[in-house]
From Swiss-Prot:
It is found in: Cytoplasm. It catalyses: uridine(54) in tRNA + (6R)-5,10-methylene-5,6,7,8-tetrahydrofolate + NADH + H(+) = 5-methyluridine(54) in tRNA + (6S)-5,6,7,8-tetrahydrofolate + NAD(+); uridine(54) in tRNA + (6R)-5,10-methylene-5,6,7,8-tetrahydrofolate + NADPH + H(+) = 5-methyluridine(54) in tRNA + (6S)-5,6,7,8-tetrahydrofolate + NADP(+). It holds the Pfam family GIDA. GO terms for biological process: tRNA methylation; tRNA wobble uridine modification. This is Methylenetetrahydrofolate--tRNA-(uracil-5-)-methyltransferase TrmFO. GO terms for molecular function: flavin adenine dinucleotide binding; tRNA (uracil(54)-C5)-methyltransferase activity, 5,10-methylenetetrahydrofolate-dependent. The gene is trmFO. Its cofactor is FAD. It comes from Lactobacillus gasseri (strain ATCC 33323 / DSM 20243 / BCRC 14619 / CIP 102991 / JCM 1131 / KCTC 3163 / NCIMB 11718 / NCTC 13722 / AM63). InterPro entries: FAD/NAD-bd_sf (IPR036188), MnmG-rel (IPR002218), MnmG-rel_CS (IPR020595), MnmG_N (IPR040131), TrmFO (IPR004417).
Amino acid sequence: MVKNVTVIGGGLAGSEAAWQLAKRGIEVELYEMRPKKTTPAHETANFAELVCTNSMRSNQLSNAVGLLKEEMRQLDSLIMKAADETAVPAGGALAVDRDKFSSVVTQTLKDLPNVHVHEEEITKIPKDGITIIATGPLTSDTLAEQIKDFCGTDSLHFFDAAAPIVAASSIDRDIVYKKSRYDKGEAAYLNCPMTKEEFFNFYKNLVSAETATLHGFEDKNVFEGCMPIEVMAKRGEKTMLFGPLKPVGLEDPKTGKTPYAVVQLRQDNAASTMYNIVGFQTHLKYGEQKRVFSMIPGLENAKFVRYGKMHRNTYIASPEVLNANYEARKQAGLFFAGQMTGVEGYVESAGSGLIAGINAARETVGEETLVFPKSTALGSMAHYITTTSAKHFQPMNASYALLPKLDYKVRNKQERHLEISKRALKDLETFKEEKKLD
């Protein structure tokens, strides 16, 4: 019996899948086309490079992605190990030093004797053996065409964007102040307060700023969770005040009052030499980013280490293509994982790779593949992307809306979410014992 599996793609999902396979004694042939062939969004040759934000969002069990993280920790996730090991201060969220994070993942996999890394592009879907395709939303054109033909449907797409990063040394510390919203967790964010006059001056310049040309870009194709700040601003002059510029819970210690608007800066590396502008994904031209974002109090003389940018993301019509074990319906032994399946977010992508890796390993040794319980965050994501309406299919983050309701009432929303999380972790533990998952 063949005891090796091919994993195509060394992103979050592919890296997690390779880890889950390798720890079960499977020989892994891991293909990653970088650095020989790169993408519009990647900057390094490392596995699991974070191309958008450095935040993995909430770390709280009263939040769906916090639950997802804990489930993955219970299943010995490499991505969660690396994230916890390279975490930087972020209040109640989990943010990482992006370079250290990807380096830990890369080195861990390369050190495993049964993971064989191939730096080359795969242009055809293997017809034999067991394969996991986790090439991400920036799959090379040649393979993307193969996947499109295999799926028998037009590939779907949306546009994703990354926020700018500024040098810590260029931030005016006399203006900004350190605080987390509602003083939750440690004071992890630098806050740039705006008066009403400063906000509306910034708003007018932002909505009139020139954007870079991107073929096929339309507002309707922007994923809501990573919307460019200029697109958000154009939806209404006060829209940003309910989004990334929300001032609630961020009183200025100098005045004791809540500013009209607040722009937050989050630490981007462990050395605290870089900060990203939270929620400021953008597709403005670089010169316009410098001009407009330097209007933010405290960033008048900011040095931009990286400007924001936008790229096209592609995903497959999973409801028509996949089973809830992430295996293709029309080819046994072929699995898909990551953002290309329609799960949206770093942690969600890694979670799909975790399931695909476990199932590919089980199929390799002749065991039944697993469908995780719908009452878990992992299972609810797999269930959603494979059973929802294909016609209206859109990328989806982890959400309590995907999980079954409690069979008893809990009025307080946070307490209700905690109860759902407790049930999920209990069900996962039972599932692990029944299926002998280590």
